[in-house]
Amino acid sequence: MESVYLNEVIQFTLGKNPTRIRAQVDELYTPEDFENDLHCIHSTKEGMGCIINLIKSKCSPISEQTEAKCITSNFLRCDFDIGKIYAWYFCYQFNEGKSFEQQIEMYHQGTTLSVKKLNIKTIGELKIILPDIQKQRTIGNLYRQSIIQNDLMVKQAENVRKFTMTLIRRIDED
């Protein structure tokens, strides 16, 4: 396992200022696209990299449906060698990893701004531990599956609540 700075293994591309983009609205990468990619609504393919939402400090793999979209300045595209980094492992480390959380907290110390937006320099200076690619795949796939399972459980809880409310209304009407 090696520990490396992100800027040593990832090529970052900052999104464009929205006022300078001439693309159609449907060609822009939106926060909804980000959430859909993270929650596996769209299918992903290896080698497409990841997107970091700089406002939320979250990371998601790029899906086939959003790979050609133009990203705005609230997003950072991450391209890397798929033989070195597995996208879902990187997302797990960025979104849930204790090491990243501690490094980001240290960066935010002394910041008085209410919006603690990350920047490309700070992200590049974060360190990541890179185990062998097979271990990354195992961790990343488990992380992806946990997101899918959580979403299914939330949906099931919503359905149970709707059903219960329907029963209550029927009893109340009698």
Question: Which residues does each predicted region cover?
Answer:
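Short, charged, solvent-exposed linker or helix-capping segments at domain edges/interfaces
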Residues: 40, 87-91, 137-140
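A short beta-sheet element
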Residues: 55-96
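A positional/architectural concept
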Residues: 8-70
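Short, positively charged
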Residues: 86-124
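Hydrophobic/aromatic residues in well-formed alpha-helices
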Residues: 6-9, 90, 123, 128
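A short glycine-rich beta-alpha junction/loop motif
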Residues: 69-74, 110-137
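Non-catalytic DNA-recognition/assembly elements of restriction-modification systems
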Residues: 1-36, 130-174
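Hydrophobic residues at beta-strand termini and immediately following loops
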Residues: 29, 78, 126
